[in-house]
Amino acid sequence: MTDRMEKKTYQEIASTTQAQTTGAFIDTLNGIRLNELLRRYSVIDCHKTGAEQELLALRDDIKKLIESSRGGATGMHGFIGERVQVSFSNARAAMQGQEKAYMLIDDNGMTDYLRGKTLIQQKACISDKALGLTHVVAHSEKYPIFIQQNGIYQIPRDFYEKYQRFVNMAEETALKLRKEDLRMWKRVQEFKAAVPEAKVEPMVVTYDEIQAGAVNGTIDREMASVEKEYRKQRNAAENACKPTLQEGLKVTACSAALEGLVDGGVSILEHKQERGKIRNFEKEDWKEIGIDTAKGVGKGAVRGAAVYAATNVAHVPAGIASATVTGAFGVIENSSRYIKGECTGKECAIGIADACASAAVSAISTELGRRFIPIPFLGSLIGNAAGTLLYKVAKKPILRFFNSIMNAEPCIA
């Protein structure tokens, strides 16, 4: 009797411990994913803050510029364009976690701003009716060193689209264009002939967007674009850190292997106590060990999948989810024995009560162990082992009391 009780004790401890190990493992995985998600959120929030600060500073700068009427009615948009190009580019870089690349010079000299070490001159002009290219030629003649130092000219985005359309267009194609488009094609070709080495790039905004009456709306749209990118990055972070089928399958496989190993090991120990030494095992013994191992693999797979789904879909704590699965196994096992006629209804009820109580104690003790010993895995396992041992001590009188209630004669008034 004592041997059987000892076997039952270490078997229950091994069973509940490996069950809670699965729960602790899944809980740790979930914690790692959650911590990574929070880390990414923090980084994205910093990116957004940097971008918004850049745009808010731009709005204040533009307000002062307009109030001072710098450049007058015909030239103010040029100064606005410089600031918008610099700030928008830096805000977009901030949203991607990059350093500021643009720096405003603002000295009315050869260079309007820098992009790293690259010199940039902005030409946002319509007075020449040639996309500002006439002003580019004039600047290159005044500052020949600008192109020699690999300087770049930037024109409004809508101007650049027209420039790109005409710059490589063949003459026979151009001759089929409308009169105004043909005129523009000729101006672009004249520009390329005059300064073939000039590099032209688009600004991030159009000519109309940098006018004094429209620039605040332009900044508002960029603010909205920052918010949109912020949401996009948060969604990407959530998708990268969410539970996946692949991870669930890995957890299921690990749980199956663990439970199969534990149940197989327990079965070997039980047979060893009966046979003395492993070399004395008979064919039937190994068959039973194989069956026990296979059952463990099956239960482990079910447990791993169920706990992973419960913690990530229903957000049930891993310890409780694992204990619930253990209790369910106990209910199924005792019900199956009753259906097969291997036990009485009373024995079935007692077995189910025992399984559920054991699972509840395992869940509670595991949670207490995790809280009082905040070391991943170790706290949960120590708590579970201690709880299981205490339950074994208290179980006998509890089951005797439960049994006496079931055997009591009903009182008839």
Question: Where do the PLM segments sit?
Answer:
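Surface-exposed polar/charged interaction patches
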Residues: 16-19, 31-35, 44, 213-217, ...
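Charged, low-complexity interaction regions
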Residues: 277-281
